[in-house]
């Protein structure tokens, strides 16, 4: 099962961010000099619907302790229905993580618009604290899970 928090644990969090909304909110948060956790590595994708099972599972198998997916609010997708596809895929991914005995709380989906820099900082910081409490990813370096 899950590892408990270890002293000195520094989580590795991957953030897949929609180019049109969440990535722009990250830029706004940075230019507003908001305090944001340094444990997040942001990867810009054109739409949150581009994040598939392979991207998420590969990140976990390669040592990510948590994954944060950021997309446009439902109904505001630049590509019309992309975030609806994301929401369905996210629900399936949570089930897959549970099957792998990896706490589904290590994966989070948040809708953050381009003007929500404060919300972006809040979501990132709260998710980082959640991952710190969960401890290191138990799948990291284990080829047999």
Whereabouts are the PLM-identified features?
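Iron-sulfur-associated redox domains of electron-transfer enzymes in respiratory
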Residues: 1-145
């Amino acid at each position: 099962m899950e590892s408990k928090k270890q002293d000195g644990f520094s989580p590795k969090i991957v953030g897949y961010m929609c180019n049109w909304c969440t990535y722009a909110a990250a830029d706004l948060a940075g230019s507003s000099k908001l305090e944001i956790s340094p444990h997040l590595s942001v990867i810009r994708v054109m739409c949150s619907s581009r994040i598939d099972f392979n991207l998420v599972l590969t990140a976990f198998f390669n040592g990510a302790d948590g994954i944060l997916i950021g997309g446009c609010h439902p109904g505001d997708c630049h590509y019309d229905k992309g975030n609806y596809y994301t929401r369905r895929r996210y629900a399936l991914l949570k089930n897959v993580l549970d099957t792998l005995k990896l706490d589904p709380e290590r994966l989070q989906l948040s809708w953050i618009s381009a003007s929500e820099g404060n919300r972006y900082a809040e979501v990132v910081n709260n998710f980082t604290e959640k991952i710190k409490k969960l401890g290191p990813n138990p799948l990291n370096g284990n080829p047999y899970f």
